[in-house]
Amino acid sequence: MQLAQRLCELLMCRRKAAPVADYVLLQPSEDVELRELQAFLDENFKQLEITPADLRTFSRDTDVVNHLLKLLPLYRQCQSKCAFLKGYLSEGCLPHTRPAAEVECKKSQRILEALDILILKLVVGEFAMSEADSLEMLLDKFSTDQASLVEVQRVMGLVDMDCEKSAYMLEAGAAATVAPPTPPAVVQGESGVREDGETVAAVSAFACSSVSDSLIPEETGVTRPMMSLAHINTVSCPTVMRFDQRLLEEGDEEDEVTVMSPSPEPVQQQPPVEPVQQQPQGRGSHRRRYKESAPQETLPTNHEREILDLMRHSPDVPREAVMSPTMVTIPPPQIPFVGSARELRGVKKKKPTAAALLSSA
């Protein structure tokens, strides 16, 4: 019943105000923000000694207060973020997350430092921020700077690593090219050590890589190098060929020449020398073998035998002298060493005549 009555009064606008009514006047929001800002400044900027009277003065300048109020939540957010990252780094941070946490912590510290400068300049009045300059742009600037610094450090690290690797490769290449000098090779033959590798450099000056075998015949008097010419592909060494005197070509008996070196001493008879073993000779030999000088023993020829037969039948000649003929020893002719064996090739050995045999007997 009462509800219907009140509804009718409300519709007919007949309701009156109660005689006792309590109205509470709420404080404006600006005072709450100023108190919060005062607490923030006392907490972080106590050294500035900003009093409430100063804040009332600042309140007259709405731009300064508005900017300070905008910076307040951002500052507290960066503070909490930096405190969390410092605690995370100090309490068992994972190895793979430590670089990222360090970067974010440094970024938060840099933002806090920049906000400190902004607040100080706003309070002092030497800095004014326009409405167009938002805090997002400021954060983007600092984040871009931090990212740029990180990228620059990363690039510098890669450059340093590249320099180290390049230096290592260059040092390794130089050590490989500069090898220690090899000792000279010593060539040994039948007569012992001949000469070092520098002298006996028996390589061809114009050797071709297509040569499959040595160009020096096996039966010549020229010693072969240690390796065949097929393995030589350089033209840096001169041609040095050694002549072996023991491998001279021996011709027939009529063309054989006996050569001895001249000496001021008188020629003496020497004991017989063992015959030299004949070795196979090649076609390209242009030298002749020098045999050691020794006296030659010759047998009587047919003409000498006829003379001996006549002397046996002659009664005036003693029989012992005829029956026991001695071997005639002919000393070697003293021919001086003139020219090469090719030049001496034309010298023929003269056969002893009967008159020479008789005179020697």
Curated annotation (Swiss-Prot):
The keyword Phosphoprotein applies. Phosphorylated. Belongs to the herpesviridae UL51 family. Pfam families: Herpes_U44 (PF04533). Plays several roles during the time course of infection, including egress of virus particles from the perinuclear space and secondary envelopment of cytoplasmic capsids that bud into specific trans-Golgi network (TGN)-derived membranes. It is found in: Virion tegument; Host cytoplasm; Host Golgi apparatus. InterPro entries: Herpes_U44. A lipid is attached at C8 (S-palmitoyl cysteine). Residues 251-299 are annotated as: Disordered. Residues 266-281 have a biased composition (Low complexity). One of its GO terms (cellular component) is host cell Golgi apparatus. The keyword Phosphoprotein applies. Disulfide bonds: none annotated. It comes from the Viruses. Oligomerizes. Interacts with UL103; this interaction mediates UL103 incorporation to virions. This is Tegument protein UL51 homolog. Keywords: Host cytoplasm, Host Golgi apparatus, Lipoprotein, Palmitate, Phosphoprotein, Virion, Virion tegument. It comes from Human cytomegalovirus (strain Merlin) (HHV-5). Its main location: virion.
